[in-house]
Amino acid sequence: MARPAAGPGGISKFGNDFGLQRWRNTPRYDQTQPLEGSVCGYGLSNPFHESLFSCPAASWPQAKLGRPNTPQEPSKDLKRILSQISPKRIEATIRKLVSFGTRHTLSTQTNATHGIGAARDWIASEFQRYADASDGRLTVKVIGYEQQPDGSRVLFPVRISDVVATLKGSEDPERVYVVSGHYDSRASDPLDYKTDAPGANDDASGVAVSLEIARVMSQRNLPRPKATIVFAAVAGEEQGLLGSNFLAQTYRNSSTNVEGMFTNDIIGSSTADDGTKEPHVIRLFAQGVPPLNVENQAMREKRLMIGGENDTPARQLARFVKETAENKYTDMQVSVIYRLDRYLRGGDHRPFLEAGYPAARFTEPNENYAHQHQNIRIEKDPKTGKDIQYGDLPEFCDFDFISRVGKVNAAALWNLAMSPGMPRNVRVDTSDLSNDSKFTWDPPAGGNAGVGGYEIVWRSTIAPFWTNVMDVGMVQAATIDLSKDNVIFGIRARGKNGERGVAVLPFP
């Protein structure tokens, strides 16, 4: 179905209410194909959005300086990486993890073919296989701790193990980016550690992405990333984000500079329970205002005063993903969702956020809850009388879709690791009233060695993504003839290779 034409002033022909209700009640456009074109560069497809962003006020204030902010073109090396991500390898990984029966955190850790211990050992051996072929680039560790009973989802003492593969950076190795999936699974009862729980989508799919990107990026015929990339498979997610919390706290306790973390959790299918398919869309959940243990009350009040609640480190990270990973090479649209997670759900990005690190969650666009946290069974649908297959089985995974999600992750991670880190102590001068904007900043934590210059980006206060950019050169202070009252600004570093980093919101 073609998109509806717009009437005068860009108002949808669905009516002056922007057609919200009628849009929901009409057939969807063809969601089996990637979207062609976009609105204001945001890839929006709903007539409500088309109306909103085509109105004259949407582009105010019209800056007469700088240039439009455009997506970052993948480098030659990144194109090679994306071309090698294999749906067949991803499928093989998922089926292998399913073969262990259950991967419940409380299941056996001593059986060689069944339970979470067997899954852990196999994942570690796969990472090690890639490490052996990497000429020393990739190193593998299994780290963990003894979790005591918690009166909730941990019935007895159990070892929580994270499998961590590290691709050390060549120029700025102390700057770290993490990608993870959780390898534990569960059945209907979160305490049932004996019933088979295949966990194909939740979350063998996420583990498969970590493994596949590690395989490709660690190859000897590719340059090392400038910053360090960590590929992790964590346990205990279903029992309370245990493995991810341990990993995040391990980094925090060692003062590791983690500048970005992604978890891939339930990325196995684009098909909803009503059959709706969106195979070229992936959701990315990004938290707003940080928790108080990360940003104190005074800082929070300042953020709210300047209208910075939509410009937290997590959301800047999500904007970066949108700008670098939505292209013809990934064949995906990144739908950024401005909230921590879905309702009633949680994910492994949360412990990283609570540790003070920018983090976000990738999740499929449509979920089928008959295929999550369910014992394998067939039941009659009380409405239709048809049989419903319950259970998180491989047959419900779309391996081509998962590989495209892997490409989105790879594009984001490679661009992050090849660009400079985030500028520090970014400030806007509010010492007096003026119609221009004065900024100062310090170099990234790794210094200016890989920096080729700095850029000021901005957008209107109602726009979700950066729309304009000005190159200000190799300086640490700049004044721009545009009022800080009317737009949202960010400062980002640009590498000598042209790669642009993550922007940082200036505070007074």
Curated annotation (Swiss-Prot):
EC assignment: 3.4.-.-
Record has Translocase as a keyword: no
Family: Belongs to the peptidase M28 family. M28B subfamily.
Sequence intervals crossing the membrane: none
Family matches, as InterPro entries: FN3_dom, FN3_sf, M28_fam, Peptidase_M28
Cofactor requirements of the protein: Zn(2+)
Subcellular location per the Swiss-Prot or TrEMBL entry: Secreted
Residues annotated as glycosylated: N111, N253, N435
Residues annotated as binding Zn(2+) 1: H182, D202, D265
Cofactor binding, note field: Binds 2 Zn(2+) ions per subunit.
Binding site for Zn(2+) 2: D202, E238
GO cellular component: a single term: extracellular region
Residue ranges occupied by any Fibronectin type-III domain in the UniProt entry: 422-508
GO molecular function: metal ion binding; metalloexopeptidase activity
GO biological process terms held by the UniProt record: proteolysis
Chief location category: secreted
Protein name in UniProt: Probable zinc metalloprotease MCYG_04217
Superkingdom classification of source: Eukaryota
Pfam families membership: Peptidase_M28
Keywords assigned: Glycoprotein, Hydrolase, Metal-binding, Metalloprotease, Protease, Secreted, Signal, Zinc
Keyword Zinc appears in the UniProt entry: yes
